[in-house]
Amino acid sequence: MVQRADMDSSQHTEPDTEEGEFMACSPAALDESDPDWCKTATGHIKRPMNAFMVWSKIERRKIMEQSPDMHNAEISKRLGKRWKMLNDSEKIPFIREAERLRLKHMADYPDYKYRPRKKPKVDPTASKSPTLAQSPEKSPKSRSAGKKCPKLKPSHSGNSSKSLSIKSEYGVGGDYVFGSPKSSGKAAVMKCVFMDEDDEEEEEDEEEEEDELQIRIKQEEDDESLRLYNVAKVPASPTLSSSSAESVEGASMYEDIRNGTRLYYNFKNITKQSTIPQATITLAPRPLLATTSPAGSHELLFDLSLNFTQQNPQLPDPNSGNVSLSLVDKDLDSCSEGSLGSHFDFPDYCTPELSEMIAGDWLEANFSDLVFTY
């Protein structure tokens, strides 16, 4: 009976298939009889091998038998390349073996949970000298002092560079020379510690004052340039009044406008005389027609002939650009003696061009055609 049982067991363990042959030659099959087949010497439970690990374990032993002097890293490289070159049909037995080992691992260790090893943390304080370990209170102070210095230095250097750039922009640079702060020695520490924030605030205030001053200067220059361009305006504008007579004339024109009298200007006659060296602008107001409208308001039409000439740029004239109002000044005395209803009653200073314009038909059918005809 005992012999038959031995024979049955031997027949059962004989490798009849490829899987049996693989199991027989597998190195893991020899260790499965041990209950702790998947534990290390320290008691750590290893993970079950996958297909590549099963195959590489067998092939590694073969390579080590053939070339024992080969490095382990070189063997791993060769095994990885060979595993990639294998066909799927050649990998099937190793995949099945890995699945069998996984199921056995689950049966032997049902409460297993993968927990990777944590690397032991090296205590940095253990390598320090005992003198430093005994006085830990001084180290934070020194670190904090070291941290303060780099914070203050860039701010001060940034302000100095900013002030230098501002002064160079406005033409003030070159008066002061700032040296680069030294980063070594006690002097640097003293500079960091005794930095006063009031000095920085004063510097910022000075910079703001300089900016405001420059802005004011620019505004004044712009105003002066605008005044030069605003010379040739309508005679009734207050900016054109340069004498008392002109101011009286401007006031009277404004009063006429308020009382209902409308002023119309004609700028058709604009001629250029190249023979005259200096540019003059003459304004000759002439009473062309005074009629009584159906509403009973007096409408006065003016012809302002503006004579513009080109000025030689090499010969600037201080009087150029001023409006010559000699005719208006002379006729102010005769305003009270006028026979017409308007106070603008001038002697006959008509030129041939003005007489041609006066002879034309000034009364248009539409009221809008009378205003600012060009």
From Swiss-Prot:
Annotated region (Disordered), positions in chain: 1-22, 112-165
Location relative to the cell: Nucleus
Keyword ATP-binding assigned: no
DNA-binding region as annotated in the record: 45-113
Bias kind Basic and acidic residues: ranges: 1-15
MF term (GO), any: DNA-binding transcription activator activity, RNA polymerase II-specific
Feature: compositional bias, Polar residues: 126-137
Induction field: By chrd.
GO biological-process terms attached to the record: brain development; camera-type eye morphogenesis; negative regulation of transcription by RNA polymerase II; nervous system development; neuron differentiation; positive regulation of transcription by RNA polymerase II
Domain of life from the UniProt record: Eukaryota
PROSITE patterns referenced in this protein's UniProt entry, alphabetically: HMG_BOX_2
Assembly, per entry: Interacts with nlk.2.
Protein name: Transcription factor Sox-11-B
Phylogenetic placement of the source organism: Eukaryota, Metazoa, Chordata, Craniata, Vertebrata
Gene from which the chain derives: sox11-b
